[in-house]
Structures are given as structure tokens and as C-alpha cells.
Amino acid sequence: HHVNARLQLLRENAFDQPWLPALTVGVHGKFNDGIDDINAGTKGAVAGGALTSLAGIHDASGVDFTLYASKLFPDLPRPVLVNLGGRATKGVWNGLGGFADDYALLLEGNVVVFVTPNLGLAVEYKQQAREYRSIGNLVKTAGDWWTIDAAYVVNKHLTVAAGYGHFGNVLNHTANGVWGITLKYEF
């Protein structure tokens, strides 16, 4: 479960400065109701508090803080949008693996090329904290995440997107990526 709040501190090109990016801060509350069950072994996944002993994961909830800079470059042969930011988090795999005791400062960003006014191609990168230590073939050190996506804006309300996401090393380390498609309708 996620609850997000974002505030734009500075608009792009503010103060008539064409080089100035937009700056946005965010607070992101996260809750993973399955962590306590996994850690206790009640679902048969990992027993005996292994998440706590492997990575110091004690919590099923946490709060992330973000700062992002975004800049559109419309005068290139095709318009390009660049987003670069930092995330302060206690989350392991964005909270999917629970929450550790200490914050880590992680980099993330994406680049979108607008092939047409309605079609965009994007790549994204998310650095991941290295909370888990490698234990033979059972647990591997976490790897960074990346995605490749294509999105088509059908109209001002509907967007269709498809892509591939690679999630580094996860505990099962056999299914580290996934193809996906989304339909987004905004009122």
C-alpha cells in the first residue's frame, strides 16, 4: 500500500531561466502487510525471523523522501524529457522486502524520447540498497532495477503503455524481470 504527496518547489524555466529544471519533493508512505508473515514463516516462505537476521528488516512500513529535477529539451531533433532524482529510503526492493533500520540515499532517473506527439519511448534506472548479503545460491546481493517502456497517449484521458522491467537479484533469483502493459485513464 502506498500514499504519496508531492510538491513542486520550482517550475521549469522559472525566473525566465531556460536552463532551469523543475524541482519536486515527495513524501511516500509505504506498508507491506505480508512482511511479518514471511519473517515469522507462517506462509512457508522464510522461517524463524530470517529477514531480520539477514538484513535487519524489522518493519512492514516506512517513509521515503524524494527530490527530483525534470527538464524537457524540445529543440532536439525529437523532444526529450530527462528526470533525475534521489530517494532516501529504508525500503528493501522499494519496500517489497520490508524496511531496514537505516536510510540509504539512492539515485534514480529516466529519459523519455517523444517519437511523435503521442508516442514516447523511455528507459528508467533505480539504484537499490544492498541490504541483503549474498548467501551462496540461496540469497544474492540486490541488483539495481531498470525498465524499457513505450507509451501511447490515445487522448487527454487515456494512455496505453507496455514495457519490460528488470529487478536485479531478488530472493528467488529465477524470475528477475517481467513484461507488462498498463491502461491509464484520468478524469
Task: Annotate each predicted stretch with a short phrase.
Residues 34-38, 91-95, 130-135, 169-174:
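Outer-membrane beta-barrel proteins
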Residues 23-29, 82-88, 109, 123-127, ...:
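Transmembrane beta-barrel strands of outer-membrane/channel proteins
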Residues 1-103:
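Outer-membrane pore/translocation modules
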Residues 9-13, 19, 73-77, 113-119, ...:
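Outer-membrane beta-barrel strand-turn architecture
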Residues 110-159:
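Glycine/small-residue-rich hydrophobic helix-like segments
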Residues 1-7, 63-67, 105-109, 119, ...:
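Hydrophobic, lipid-facing positions within transmembrane beta-strands of outer-membrane proteins
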Residues 3, 152, 158, 174-187:
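Outer-membrane beta-barrel "beta-signal"
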